[in-house]
Amino acid sequence: MSFRARQTPGRRYLLLFAAILPPRRQELILSETTLATDRIGTDPIGRLLIDFSIPAIIGMLVNAVYNIVDRIYLGQGVDPLAIAGVGIVMPVMMIIQAVSMLVGIGANSLFSIRLGERRSDEVEKIMGHAFALLFLFPAVCITICMIFMEPILRDIMKVSDQIYPYANSYLRIILYGAIFAAMSPGLTHFIRSDGHPKTSMLVQIVGAVTNIILDPIFIFTFNLGVAGAAWATIISQFISFVFVISYFSSKWTRLRFRIKHMKLNAKLTGKILAIGFAPFIMQFAMSLVGVLQNAVILQYSGDEALTAMTIFFSVLTVIIMPLMGIGQGTQPIIGYNYGAKQYGRVKKCFKYSYLACTGVLSAGFIVTQFAPGFCFSLFSNDTGSLRELGMLTIRICTSAFPIIAMQMMGGQFFQAIGKPVQGAILSLSRQIIFFIPSLLFLPILFGVIGLPRIYGVYWAFPISDLLSATLSGIFIYREFSNWKKIKKKEKE
């Protein structure tokens, strides 16, 4: 099998529309270029990070807008409680996203490693398995959620009577398009690893722009409120999915989704799921923690505190998405060079990406600490107690921001080099091992010393950030030390 050749930047934007070009023109352009993936093992790391990460960052920022635009419109034009209604069902959607990450990132990491090893015979098999799994797993999740909708909302998530109408309306419609919500981002990873990060970015932009355009139309013009926000979201997800499929159906890439490769093989499926387990468990843990956290908030406060926390997570999404973009951009670089045993390039890639993430987080820290009111006002025009609580929530929860780059990049690093156990441990450290005990213990401690118990929920964030970043640093140091020992033995 031969792979997609490298294109000039201008041509990359035409990839999704290749089917409308004359065949002779397509063949001419293909013949003018060289193998796109070759440069991952030879070009300067800094240039590769820019080429791969910048489009991913833009795409993830657009994706952040994708995720929060509903809340902006609902908070400003419908009801602040509508934000809480959307926010409280996010753990369910995070499970769908976790499934997408389990398959998409796991398959893409294996895909990149196999490219570095020049094992081209396995590449399309990996893609075919990813497609089948991204359809199967979300379908199971949707079926379970539809059957047990009310018990999930009432008994597990403890949704109040005031929030229930918003939560039920939004979740029921969102589930209709959950398969596309999983498949579109899950398959987009392959476009990036095929050597076309800008095309991958374009797919995300198309979906986000569609959502931004449709949201006010469905919410206000059609007067559908929360239901309108949900319909706009699933339509935009479907359009993104169509664009992904159109790329892999064109002559601009030799990669194809073939039915024969969608017949699941236990061994290959196991490899995909093992590598993708770290990001999956992190996202799944976030979902479970979200349910627990909402229950604790409702226990010690009420719907207003839940709304404030949802606004904080919306702000968090905007700041964290660039880090996820950097992680996505570094993944094929680290995976390819690790497969090619170019460990020096892997270490340099990690160093540069870590410094970039620290810079982003430091900027986010400055904004959230010195302008929390601005962050809050994006989602609500409230000037009373909700605003004060929202500003306090944002300040405390982001107080350890500059140090969490090590934890986030550490999990991405071990996942990219095909070491899922270490990646899973680091992912669990922040979301479960350190956060849950803090979430349960600190409110009690704050109550004992005479402070509002809800403050304990907020301080659980920076404490778990600090502890997990420390653990990640230890893991990374040990891994790099092992590489030095291997290199020393090889010289002997």
How would you name each of these model-derived features?
Residues 104, 174-192, 200-208, 229-242, ...:
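Short runs within selected transmembrane alpha-helices of multi-pass transporters and secretion channels
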Residues 3, 12-53, 111-177, 221-276, ...:
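Short alpha-helical transmembrane segments in multi-pass integral membrane proteins
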Residues 42, 46-65, 69, 92-99, ...:
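Residue-level signal for short hydrophobic patches within transmembrane helices
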Residues 83-143, 181-200, 308-366, 370-372, ...:
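Small-residue-rich hydrophobic transmembrane alpha-helices
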Residues 51-70, 173, 184, 207, ...:
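Transmembrane helical elements of multi-pass membrane transporters/channels
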Residues 74-94, 161-166, 226-229, 268-275, ...:
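Interfacial/gating helices of multi-pass transporter permease domains
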Residues 61, 65-83, 153-161, 217-224, ...:
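Helix-terminus/linker motif at the lipid-water interface of multi-pass membrane proteins
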Residues 68, 77-80, 114-117, 193-194, ...:
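Helix-loop interface residues and adjacent transmembrane-helix termini in multi-pass membrane transporters
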